[in-house]
Amino acid sequence: MAKALSKKAAQEKLDARKRQIANSTAMGDLIKRLDESKDYELRTYGYDKIQGLTQLHYEMLSFVAYKGLQKARCTRFDNFRNIVSIMWPKIEWNMWLEKAIQSLCDNDFVSWTGCAASGKTFAGALYATVWWICQPDVSAAVLTSTTKGMLRKRMWSEIQKLYTSMEWNPPGNMVDSKTVWQAVKGDEKNAIFGLAVKDGNTAAAVGHIQGIHTSRVLIVIDEATDTPQAIFDATANLYAGCEKFQMLVIGNPNSHYDPHGKFSEPKDGWASVGVETEDWETNIQLNGQPGYCLRFDAEKSPNIILGKTTYKYLMTEHQLDGARRKYGPESPLFWKFYRGFWAPSGVLKTVFNETLLAKMQAHLGYMFRREIKVIGACDPAFGGGDRAVLRFAVCGIT
């Protein structure tokens, strides 16, 4: 009798698992051993059934190649969520995380701009990890931040957490001291690389980026507002030498003319978007197509939309109200870190505002009519703890 009840209970458990799979693309940890059951039918997304391949393998194959998705009524985003549900079943999804991942599943050149406490860095690390582990032996994911300290505090910290919390044994070889997660021990080409790109590290980072040659390349630039333009320029070399290239730029909006602002510029100009615009197509990118910008506004945080603090790591109504009272709703800081949008003309105290510069087309460069003169200025910074600064300029008649 006990044996019969045991079989019945086992069958009921299996049926419950099948129903959960049928009703949700987020399959959770139940798939971990489902492939061992002869009664469980794999979703192969157009691939032939191969002995030994699990549901996770087919999700990864489908995510990389997009094969059979329309026929299977599935999207790359579905594959991504399925992979996450198998590998990290405890990850909590929210509206902003879904939008962020969706933007990367649908576009090759993506900018995320917006408020603090929006989960941008975690989302970037999660996407990079999933993207890489799907084909680690032919893939390089380059994650940059301004300094080594900020790299370890932000992006690499999230990579470490994902590595240690993975349900299955993590693939590859983690070398934390070098901020590298190699496909195999000693592989300096196919890996997740964490690079600092500022404060004396720019030339080395550019050389490292330009030296990467593999089939799949993903670039994630965190703190993009303070990232040297040379890092953005170095990506052109990568695009020309790989089969699949993707780029994500993350930052809090500061200026239309810093690297993050230029990468995020709407294809129809800044006048075509406003503080209520949540996403837009950007200028033509290396692939000849417009990029995509997704914006996170603290006033539309999932916690505020829900009317309660469900996600403690995202902006809350209490935090937003406190910042509004402390800084004022029209302060540059409130625009940058809370509204997540570029401050309107007149808010920043500058000699020439960006509206005037845009009107006079200053960003398009100059045509000099006569001989030009190159000038330079240096602040040696003998005291006060500041770093020395050297700048060059050209002057002449336009």
Task: Identify what each model region corresponds to.
Residues 2-378, 390-397:
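Phosphate/NTP-binding elements of NTP-utilizing enzymes
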